[in-house]
């Protein structure tokens, strides 16, 4: 079954025959409540953030050829694929984000991987490429289980790749950051074994008398 994205709102609550309480707004803002997104949808959003609001349509099919040899038009197959994947193409080149909001989000994503208090700092602290990222631990509401997420992009100042790692019932999102790190390393032709050794090594402190 294909999933459509759901952005939590009062209208969605009404469809579920639920009351939208003031606290729901806070829950929705941090990704809880009725929000529902697929990894591909999240990858599109992350790419848009990395590009400072520029919208890139998702393309997963290069061409489709009919049995008679004719080619299916791009508009036709894109419409079909987007419907099945629950994607919405906004038909706009850029989203109207305030510059200060984008900057705040980007700096927050930089801090996740590069600042000592970041939830993915231990994974990326010695990584040779600066990565913007966000870990996520999504409560499922079922027996205390949590889905693990990591979304990110690299390099930070000149993005080439957006990435999403999702593990159902995977626990804390920091675990998925390790998978994302290795995928990024592979994409840029880095030695993944060496990357793992460098980023997981325990830092030492030299005491000078």
Say what each PLM segment does.
Residues 170-174:
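Ordered, soluble secondary-structure elements with a strong preference for glycine-centered loop motifs
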Residues 3-168, 205-209:
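Beta-lactam-recognizing serine transpeptidase/beta-lactamase-like catalytic domain environment
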Residues 38-44, 175-182:
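Short amphipathic alpha-helical face segments that pack within enzyme cores
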Residues 54-55, 156, 175-178, 187-192:
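Glycine-rich loops and low-complexity Gly/Arg-rich segments
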Residues 71-72, 84, 181-209:
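Short, gly/Ser/Thr-rich active-site loops of penicillin-recognizing serine hydrolases
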């Amino acid at each position: 079954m294909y999933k459509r994205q759901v952005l939590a709102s009062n209208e969605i609550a009404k469809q579920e025959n639920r009351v939208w309480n003031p606290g729901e707004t806070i829950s929705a803002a941090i990704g809880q409540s009725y929000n529902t997104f697929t990894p591909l949808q999240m990858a599109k959003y992350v790419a848009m953030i990395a590009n400072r609001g520029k919208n890139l349509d998702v393309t997963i099919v290069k061409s489709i050829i009919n049995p008679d040899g004719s080619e299916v038009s791009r508009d036709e197959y894109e419409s079909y694929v987007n419907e099945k994947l629950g994607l919405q193409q906004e038909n706009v080149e850029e989203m109207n984000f305030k510059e200060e909001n984008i900057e705040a989000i980007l700096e927050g994503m930089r801090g996740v991987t590069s600042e000592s208090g970041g939830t993915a700092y231990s994974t990326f602290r010695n990584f040779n490429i600066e990565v913007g990222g966000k870990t996520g631990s999504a409560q499922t509401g079922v027996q205390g289980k949590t889905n693990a997420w990591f979304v990110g992009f690299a390099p930070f100042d000149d993005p080439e790749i957006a990435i999403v790692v999702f593990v159902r019932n995977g626990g804390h999102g920091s675990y998925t950051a390790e998978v994302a790190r290795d995928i990024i390393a592979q994409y840029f032709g880095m030695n993944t074994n060496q990357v793992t050794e460098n980023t997981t090594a325990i830092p030492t402190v030299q005491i000078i008398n």
